[in-house]
């Protein structure tokens, strides 16, 4: 139960941070999704730092890891988890799996949005 609460609180903070970046980037104007790119890249950088930190400091509490990674970064961007998982596949020498994971995730994600839009436009 404590872990669920820790993730819940972290996700709220991460979501608020994401909203702040979106609001700030909107002031810049333009049609390029700069906020999403900033969020994805900074979240991936933070995930790498945290994952490395938790490896080096193996004795840190599980609740801290959950709060920072699953909670805050999960609320901020799930792209950081995607990036970490792809990197770990590459690091383990599973290059074919990594390529399949990256291409498959991106293609399936875009296809999912396209199919959803088509359904809503048809029945909407």
From Swiss-Prot:
InterPro entries: FluC. The chain crosses the membrane at residues 1-21, 36-56, 70-90, 100-120. It is a multi-pass membrane protein. It is found in: Cell inner membrane. One of its GO terms (cellular component) is plasma membrane. Keywords: Cell inner membrane, Cell membrane, Ion channel, Ion transport, Membrane, Metal-binding, Sodium, Transmembrane, Transmembrane helix, Transport. Na(+) is not transported, but it plays an essential structural role and its presence is essential for fluoride channel function. One of its GO terms (biological process) is cellular detoxification of fluoride. Pfam families: CRCB (PF02537). GO terms for molecular function: fluoride channel activity; metal ion binding. It catalyses: fluoride(in) = fluoride(out). Belongs to the fluoride channel Fluc/FEX (TC 1.A.43) family. This is Fluoride-specific ion channel FluC. It comes from Methylobacterium sp. (strain 4-46). The lineage of its organism: Bacteria, Pseudomonadati, Pseudomonadota, Alphaproteobacteria, Hyphomicrobiales.
């Amino acid at each position: 139960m404590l872990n669920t609460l820790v993730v819940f609180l972290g996700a709220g903070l991460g979501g608020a941070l994401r909203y702040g970046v979106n609001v700030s980037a909107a002031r810049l104007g333009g049609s390029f999704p700069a906020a999403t790119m900033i969020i994805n890249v900074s979240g991936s950088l933070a995930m790498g730092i945290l994952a490395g930190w938790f490896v080096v400091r193996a004795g840190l509490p599980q609740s801290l890891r959950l709060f920072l990674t699953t909670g805050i970064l999960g609320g901020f961007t799930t792209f950081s988890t995607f990036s970490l998982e792809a990197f770990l596949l590459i690091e383990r020498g599973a290059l074919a799996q990594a390529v399949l994971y990256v291409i498959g995730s991106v293609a399936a994600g875009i296809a999912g949005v396209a199919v959803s839009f088509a359904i809503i436009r048809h029945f909407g």
